[in-house]
């Protein structure tokens, strides 16, 4: 799975701490759960910017601070940068 490959990349090639790797994985899982609730599925290759915006709004509605939301977005930016480098996606849904 793409998420597992990304987390292994962080763990073994980037030497991120296990705590950081787990946090990145949790951030991706949160988006996955949101996507499944909203559109019935999660395929990181097909995520659209609109879904990301809706997810951000839902996080803010749940009381997440802007700092926490930005950290989650940073995790997702890293994930999509990884996918772009591997040729898995051609468009980054987080790119402005």
Question: What annotation goes with each model-predicted range?
Answer:
Residues 4-19, 25-96:
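N-terminal core-binding DNA-recognition domain of tyrosine recombinases/integrases
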